[in-house]
């Protein structure tokens, strides 16, 4: 995704 931080939070 554009925001890696958000991606990690998702998982």
UniProtKB/Swiss-Prot annotation:
Keywords: Amidation, Neuropeptide, Secreted. It is found in: Secreted. The modification Phenylalanine amide is found at residue 11. One of its GO terms (cellular component) is extracellular region. One of its GO terms (biological process) is neuropeptide signaling pathway. Belongs to the FARP (FMRFamide related peptide) family. This is CalliFMRFamide-9. It comes from Calliphora vomitoria (Blue bottle fly).
């Amino acid at each position: 995704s554009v925001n890696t931080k958000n991606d990690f939070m998702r998982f």
